[in-house]
Amino acid sequence: MSGHSKWATIRRKKGAIDAKRGAIFTRIAKEISVAAKEGGGDQEGNPRLRLAVTKAKAANMPKDNIERAIKKGTGGLEGMVYEECLYECYAPGGVAIMVDVLTDKKSRTTPEIKSILTKLGGSLANAGAVSRLFERKGQLTLKADQISEEALFDLALGAGAEDIQVNDGMYVVLTSPSEYEAVQSALSSKGLNMEESEIKYIPMTTVEVNEKETAEKVMKLIENLEANDDVQGVSSNFELGEGVELD
């Protein structure tokens, strides 16, 4: 198992990824509202909204919550006006981090992000310095006991997936953004349950951290960023050194 996968496994076990159901619903509702405002409330003609609603259903978000979020976006209900922001950051050990944000007040969020970074040895990067190290990809993660490796390869690659990784009892399916919806639909049609399913920034290469204290700072920094209410997602090129033993 690679260090990047080792880190992902630790995060799943700790429940660090959107651990609270309320946090999941809040983040998805923001995405739905922004998508509806940008492209209208008709899912058929608005791919971004369609993907957000699919994600909401996968998270078992109540139908009323979904409809309310759409109405807020289209102006049918009063709601916050959100601004999309992307923060490019550095963490200790030369690790690069991308932070996706939807905020109703950037003047509040930016100092909060800076504070989280500064307290754990991180900093904001210049525009483009970090984003060039990542690619935008669809990523679907599912437990390997649901389907054989051969069957998944046939199904996912046939639907347009680019790559499939097998790590620690999990499959990670990667797609281009344009093929993400088709691949997700193909997997769902076979009754497969996704642990995670989203379009996110994937690192082209990783930075291995072999010093325990530095690794712990990076992990804490990422967790603190994810805990911020305005943060939609965090991606990094962090790779935990194979010899690093955490408490």
UniProtKB/Swiss-Prot annotation:
Pfam families: TACO1_YebC_N, Transcrip_reg. GO terms for molecular function: DNA binding. One of its GO terms (biological process) is regulation of DNA-templated transcription. It is found in: Cytoplasm. InterPro entries: Integrase-like_N, TACO1_YebC-like_2nd/3rd_dom, TACO1_YebC_N, Transcrip_reg_TACO1-like, Transcrip_reg_TACO1-like_dom3, YebC-like. It comes from the Bacteria. Keywords: Cytoplasm, DNA-binding, Transcription, Transcription regulation. Belongs to the TACO1 family. NCBIfam families: PRK00110.1 (NF001030), PRK12378.1 (NF009044), YebC/PmpR family DNA-binding transcriptional regulator (TIGR01033). This is Probable transcriptional regulatory protein LEPBI_I0056. It comes from Leptospira biflexa serovar Patoc (strain Patoc 1 / ATCC 23582 / Paris). The lineage of its organism: Bacteria, Pseudomonadati, Spirochaetota, Spirochaetia, Leptospirales.
